[in-house]
Amino acid sequence: MSETSKIPPASTEDTSAVVAPAAGPVSQWLQQQGFEHQALEPDHVGIEQIGVDAAVLPIIAAALKSNGFDYLQCHGGYDEGPGERLVCFYHLLAMAEQLEAMASDPAAQLREVRLKVFLSREGTPVLPSIYGLFRGADWQERETFDMYGIQFDGHPHPKRLLMPEDWKGWPLRKDYVQPDFYEMQDAY
């Protein structure tokens, strides 16, 4: 990433001795195309992970879709802890390519990548919606808003999905304070 990256640091620890992870095949392709991103460590099963800034998320997602990553398997969020960052992730698969490959070789390796956007919890975290690229992002982005308070610019239905409309706060944030009592209105 460039020196002007908007990805907030994970903590205040000295990271000068940390070696950057090797770029995987998708990260290398993004570098060749001139996209700014950050290669992250692969996850526990070896899936390539890439950090991107919120501003370039739709551009990189569109580039990956045009490069065969045509299926959003999962989108979600998580909280790294009180005072730490919020994270949105997007797990993309090359599904059409995989189906064709499996027709001739059932053991064909699936191409997949996980994009991560790191957000500061200060103020209102906002990301551009990728609903226009992947329709499956609809309820997944709404759930992430509902549980973590991350807003998605350009989403056609920006409202709570699971919690009542008048709910205060974001229940899956680690700094969330549970209300003593919440009275549900009669359903009829």
Curated annotation (Swiss-Prot):
Membrane found in the keyword field: yes
Listed EC numbers: 7.1.1.-
Keyword check for Acetylation: no
One Pfam family here: Complex1_30kDa
GO biological process, one term: photosynthesis, light reaction
Gene Ontology MF terms in the entry: NADH dehydrogenase (ubiquinone) activity; quinone binding
Subunit relationships: NDH-1 can be composed of about 15 different subunits; different subcomplexes with different compositions have been identified which probably have different functions.
Similarity field: Belongs to the complex I 30 kDa subunit family.
Annotated function: NDH-1 shuttles electrons from an unknown electron donor, via FMN and iron-sulfur (Fe-S) centers, to quinones in the respiratory and/or the photosynthetic chain. The immediate electron acceptor for the enzyme in this species is believed to be plastoquinone. Couples the redox reaction to proton translocation, and thus conserves the redox energy in a proton gradient. Cyanobacterial NDH-1 also plays a role in inorganic carbon-concentration.
Protein name (Swiss-Prot/TrEMBL): NAD(P)H-quinone oxidoreductase subunit J
Gene: ndhJ
